[in-house]
Amino acid sequence: MARRPTPPGTPETTGVGHVVDLVRASIPPLHPAGLPFVAVPLAVAVAAGKRKWVRRAGLATAAACAGFFRHPNRVPPNRPGVVVAPADGEIALVDTASPPAELGLGDQPLPRVSIFLSVLDVHVQRTPVSGVVREVRHQSGQFRSADLPEASAVNERNSMLLETQSGQQIVVVQIAGLLARRIVCDARVGDVLTIGDTYGLIRFGSRVDTYFPVGTELLVQPGQRTIGGETVLATLS
């Protein structure tokens, strides 16, 4: 299930434990979905014997995959009502649009923020608010470049509806891209998630859309960089 973010006010260790924590902090952990992608090239490198080029290629591939599937700790803001970015990346769109039809929320346009993830960004997705998962729907589709506006409507996607304790609804949509052909979503209907929890991953370039209640004031602009689980996109009234 989702991995919890580091809560604010977590006590710090001292002595040897502090040194170990510093080393761990400098090397982001690996998302479980990336283990096969790292283990296979490592095994090839070990089995390469005297073939140096094979060993180097295996190690380089393992390192690249470890970087792609990195899963750094994040500390969400400790403020009520905030909606944080569900992913690292660059804000591609700040507009209004109808939520995915498969969620059955109607066609009324809602405030939306679209975040584009390049292959160099962290590719885990994090819960934008604390709440209960009311719906999770997968929709098959195309694999156009995720930075195109029409990608929200035509590309393969996975949509999740969250309901906060106050009854407000937030929709977050994982969208596959030109290279991304695999969407991972660990959240299930009925799960209770906390803001900043890791709930999924999209492999190799993608986009994540967040839909907000009507009237929500968005606090970000296109071109702005986001940090998943930390950057505030909006504050719910």
UniProtKB/Swiss-Prot annotation:
One of its GO terms (cellular component) is plasma membrane. It comes from the Bacteria. The modification Pyruvic acid (Ser) is found at S206. Binds 1 pyruvoyl group covalently per subunit. It is a peripheral membrane protein. Its cofactor is pyruvate. Pathway: Phospholipid metabolism; phosphatidylethanolamine biosynthesis; phosphatidylethanolamine from CDP-diacylglycerol: step 2/2. Catalyzes the formation of phosphatidylethanolamine (PtdEtn) from phosphatidylserine (PtdSer). NCBIfam families: PRK05305.1-3. This is Phosphatidylserine decarboxylase proenzyme. It comes from Nocardia farcinica (strain IFM 10152). The lineage of its organism: Bacteria, Bacillati, Actinomycetota, Actinomycetes, Mycobacteriales.
